[in-house]
């Protein structure tokens, strides 16, 4: 080891130095502080620039206001200012205001756009078939009405004609077809389209597509049409683009006297269209009614619940007839609207009535059922002292003596526990089977369509077990079930005090209305005094029925009851026929007889203990089911009950008809 010498090429050994944790932390902290100072400085500079820009904007605004004050424009009211804000743009240097309108028609979709805003779009399957109509205000361009008329179905063209005739002159009309709109487009409707200036509308063919824009009483602004090349196909989609020049606000407004009624009218007519003379500038129809008071009115303080949805034109017609009925109390009327729709509430406000909207619950018939429950509950909450409620629907005409009819009969509900309701509707009361407006019946079915409900019945029996939202049941069919009716009956008139005019609804269409509702008899005679009202009580009615059967002439049962000659050509007589009815629910012969009499035949209605009462050839006609009816004892031994066998069902035919 003495001769060892270090190599000069090797680095001398030294202990490795390590920075302490304190110095590392201090170094990082210094860097973070520097970054934070940089960010703070940037933020201050940004705020400074923002303040400078805002100060400049404020100074520019003050300068502009000062210049405007030196040369002020005439003062304008709020409505004019609003109209200015909403008015469409000017085209280039031209002072004329115009709208860009696009209209699309095809097999599965229609849409309308105004200045780039879609105001109609319908591409739902199996819905929206027919002619869609939109009405625009000619001064502002805002949508005043949207309707669809299924002119493939009967009578929808009549509804379209009525609507278009009620639109004020000058309004902008837009029409477009989805799927098919010509099958039931009859000559009257085609003539009206021709009068609007349309060339393609009157010639509209099977599955053609068509788009139209025009001014009522003015020029056509655009039209496109594509013919279907074959019965199995549709016309090509058409897209119509056109400019719509707008007129001055002066042309679009009426100048009525400044009264509370006219203020209501002005608010209504500035928003919606299709209501005819109520918005006439020269001679508007009244919106306040003064029917004669009803002496000793027993229903003056009975609340009236109007069950409504989104059918404002129906609601308008219904409320006009209701408010014209003798003995009406407008303060007792509440309109319940299923959904937050604007136009039905506008109709309610026009007449100065109370309207209540609520959120829809469930779907289809369950939604209607929940709407009824909510409305009935709210009615008795609004009027906690009421013992009864009158229940109406938005698609009913109300007879002039509707409240008189109820006033004369409502005591029966208080005095006879065997009664379920009083209804203004006779299911079998057609023009050829109803005759006597003073005559009343007891029936085992609940007709609805304008009826009186006892509060105790609703609160104690119906409300607690009302069908829940998940049950897709019709509320009226549920009320007719034996579990609810419990053997009780309803009082009805021979001649109805309500008329079901609606042809659009959940369980309604033009075909169904034509077959079962259009020819119902409706009383138009005021001041009818009902006859022998107290004879409608349970025991007294049995005495009356036995009296009628004892006096009735037995018809010749060898004749065909469907032939006109089955009843003699007399007037004022009472006749009786006996039909086979083996048990209480055996309605085979009755159903066939109802079919050939052209009255309600989808289910059994209007019967009392196996007996039906109606008129034929102005004769009182009684039909007794043997042996099920207790009145079978009145059948002479020599008479064989009539049996009518139903025709055999065609293969593939539906098992049951839809019922309302």
From Swiss-Prot:
It is an enzyme of class 2 (transferase). Pathway: Protein modification; protein glycosylation. Residues 59-660 are lumenal. A carbohydrate binds at residues 129, 179, 207. The modification Phosphoserine is found at residue 7. It catalyses: 3-O-(alpha-D-mannosyl)-L-threonyl-[protein] + UDP-N-acetyl-alpha-D-glucosamine = 3-O-(N-acetyl-beta-D-glucosaminyl-(1->2)-alpha-D-mannosyl)-L-threonyl-[protein] + UDP + H(+). Residues 300-646 are annotated as: Catalytic. PROSITE patterns: GG_LECTIN (PS52031). UDP-N-acetyl-alpha-D-glucosamine binds at residues 307-311, 338, 371, 394-395, 506-507. The keyword Isomerase does not apply. Its EC number is 2.4.1.-. CDD domains: GT13_GLCNAC-TI (cd02514), PANDER_GnT-1_2_like (cd13937). Belongs to the glycosyltransferase 13 family. PANTHER family: PROTEIN O-LINKED-MANNOSE BETA-1,2-N-ACETYLGLUCOSAMINYLTRANSFERASE 1 (PTHR46396:SF1). This is Protein O-linked-mannose beta-1,2-N-acetylglucosaminyltransferase 1. The lineage of its organism: Eukaryota, Metazoa, Chordata, Craniata, Vertebrata. The gene is Pomgnt1.
């Amino acid at each position: 080891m003495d001769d060892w010498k270090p190599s000069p090429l090797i680095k001398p050994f030294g202990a490795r130095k390590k920075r302490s944790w304190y110095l590392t932390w201090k170094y990082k902290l210094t860097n973070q502080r520097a970054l934070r100072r940089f960010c703070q400085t940037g933020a201050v500079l940004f705020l400074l620039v923002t303040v400078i820009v805002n100060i400049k904007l404020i100074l520019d605004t003050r300068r502009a206001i000062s210049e405007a004050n030196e040369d002020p424009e005439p003062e304008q009211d709020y409505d004019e200012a609003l109209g200015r804000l909403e008015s469409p743009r000017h085209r280039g240097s031209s002072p004329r205001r115009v709208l860009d309108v696009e209209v699309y028609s095809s097999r599965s979709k229609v849409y309308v756009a105004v200045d780039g805003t879609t105001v109609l779009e319908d591409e739902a399957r199996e819905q929206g078939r027919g002619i869609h109509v939109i009405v625009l205000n000619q001064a502002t361009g805002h949508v005043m009405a949207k309707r669809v008329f299924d002119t493939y179905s009967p009578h929808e063209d009549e509804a379209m004609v009525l609507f278009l005739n009620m639109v004020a002159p000058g309004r902008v009309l837009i029409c477009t077809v989805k799927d098919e709109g010509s099958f039931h487009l009859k000559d009257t409707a085609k003539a009206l389209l021709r009068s609007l200036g349309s060339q393609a509308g009157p010639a509209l063919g099977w599955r053609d597509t068509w788009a139209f824009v025009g001014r009522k009483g003015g020029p056509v602004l655009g039209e496109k049409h594509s013919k279907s090349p074959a019965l199995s196909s549709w016309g090509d989609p058409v897209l119509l683009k056109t400019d719509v020049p707008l007129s001055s606000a002066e042309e679009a407004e009426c100048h009525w006297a400044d009264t509370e009624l006219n203020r209501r009218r002005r608010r209504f007519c500035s928003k919606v269209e299709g209501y005819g003379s109520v918005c006439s500038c020269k001679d508007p129809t009244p919106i306040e009614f003064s029917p004669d008071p009803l002496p000793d009115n027993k229903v003056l303080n009975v609340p009236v619940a109007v069950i409504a949805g989104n059918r404002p034109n129906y609601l308008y017609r219904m409320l006009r007839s209701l408010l014209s009925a003798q003995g009406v109390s407008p303060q007792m009327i509440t309109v319940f609207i299923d959904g937050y729709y604007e136009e039905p509430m506008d109709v309610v406000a026009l007449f100065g009535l109370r309207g209540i909207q609520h959120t829809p619950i469930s779907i289809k018939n369950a939604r209607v059922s929940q709407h009824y429950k909510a409305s009935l509950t709210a009615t008795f909450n609004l009027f906690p002292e009421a013992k009864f409620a009158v229940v109406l629907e938005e698609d009913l005409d109300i007879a002039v003596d509707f409240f008189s009819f109820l006033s004369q009969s409502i005591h029966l509900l208080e005095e006879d526990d065997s009664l379920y309701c009083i209804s203004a509707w006779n299911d079998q009361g057609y023009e050829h089977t109803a005759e006597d407006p003073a005559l009343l019946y007891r029936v085992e079915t609940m007709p609805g369509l304008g009826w009186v409900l006892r509060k105790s019945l609703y609160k104690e029996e119906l409300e607690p077990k009302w069908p829940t939202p998940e049950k897709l049941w019709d509320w009226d069919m549920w009320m007719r079930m034996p579990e609810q009716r419990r053997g009780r009956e309803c009082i009805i008139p021979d001649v109805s005090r309500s008329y079901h005019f609606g042809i659009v609804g959940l369980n309604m269409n033009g075909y169904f209305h034509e077959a079962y509702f259009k020819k119902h008899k409706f009383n138009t005679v005021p001041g009818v005094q009902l006859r022998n009202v107290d004879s409608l009580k349970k025991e007294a009615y049995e005495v009356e029925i036995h009296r009628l059967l004892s006096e009735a002439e037995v018809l010749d049962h060898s004749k065909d009851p469907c032939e006109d000659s089955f009843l003699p050509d007399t007037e004022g007589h009472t006749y009786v026929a006996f039909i086979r009815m083996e048990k209480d629910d055996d309605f085979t012969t009755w159903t066939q007889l109802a079919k050939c009499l052209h009255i309600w035949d989808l289910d059994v209605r209007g019967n009392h203990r196996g007996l039906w009462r109606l008129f034929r050839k102005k004769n009182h006609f009684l039909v007794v089911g043997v042996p099920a009816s207790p009145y079978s004892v009145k059948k002479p031994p020599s008479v064989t009950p009539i049996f009518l066998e139903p025709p055999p069902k065609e293969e593939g035919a539906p098992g049951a008809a839809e019922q309302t």
